[in-house]
């Protein structure tokens, strides 16, 4: 119980691996790993790459992206 309280007090932010999304729930389409890595790391992720032929086509996938950054969720992209 004490360790849980300490964890909450330290303000540790959780992370996840996911497609980074624009505010309208659209992915960032890509052609190179370099562009995605920059986008992901600029948003606090450990790294990123261009996922070729994935669920949303060629889109940026981020590794250890902070929870505060929007990710692609089920549903439509609202452009």
Swiss-Prot record:
InterPro entries xrefs: LCN-type_CS_alpha_beta_dom (IPR044062), Scorpion_toxin-like (IPR003614), Scorpion_toxin-like_sf (IPR036574), Scorpion_toxinL (IPR018218), Scorpion_toxinL/defensin (IPR002061)
Domain of life: Eukaryota
Tissue expression notes: Expressed by the venom gland.
One GO term of the biological process aspect: defense response
Propeptide residues, chain positions: 79
Compartments where located: Secreted
Keywords: Disulfide bond, Ion channel impairing toxin, Neurotoxin, Secreted, Signal, Toxin, Voltage-gated sodium channel impairing toxin
Residues of the LCN-type CS-alpha/beta domain: 16-78
Cystine pairings recorded for this chain: 26-77, 30-50, 36-60, 40-62
Pfam family, one: Toxin_3
Signal peptide start-end: 1-14
CDD domains the record matches: neurotoxins_LC_scorpion
One GO term describing the cellular component: extracellular region
GO molecular function annotation: sodium channel inhibitor activity; toxin activity
Key word Signal present: yes
Keyword Coiled coil among UniProt keywords: no
Family designation: Belongs to the long (4 C-C) scorpion toxin superfamily. Sodium channel inhibitor family. Alpha subfamily.
Domain notes: Has the structural arrangement of an alpha-helix connected to antiparallel beta-sheets by disulfide bonds (CS-alpha/beta).
Free-text function comment from the UniProt entry: Binds to sodium channels (Nav) and inhibits the inactivation of the activated channels, thereby blocking neuronal transmission. This toxin is active against mammals.
Protein name: Neurotoxin BmK-M9
Protein source organism: Olivierus martensii (Manchurian scorpion)
């Amino acid at each position: 119980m004490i360790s849980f309280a300490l964890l909450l007090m330290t303000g540790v932010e959780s992370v996840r691996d996911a497609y980074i999304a624009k505010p309208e729930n659209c992915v960032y389409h890509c052609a190179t790993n370099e562009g995605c890595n920059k986008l992901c790391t600029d948003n606090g992720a450990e790294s990123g790459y261009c996922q070729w032929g994935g669920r949303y086509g060629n889109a940026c996938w981020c590794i250890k992206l902070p929870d505060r950054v929007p990710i692609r969720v089920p549903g439509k992209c609202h452009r």
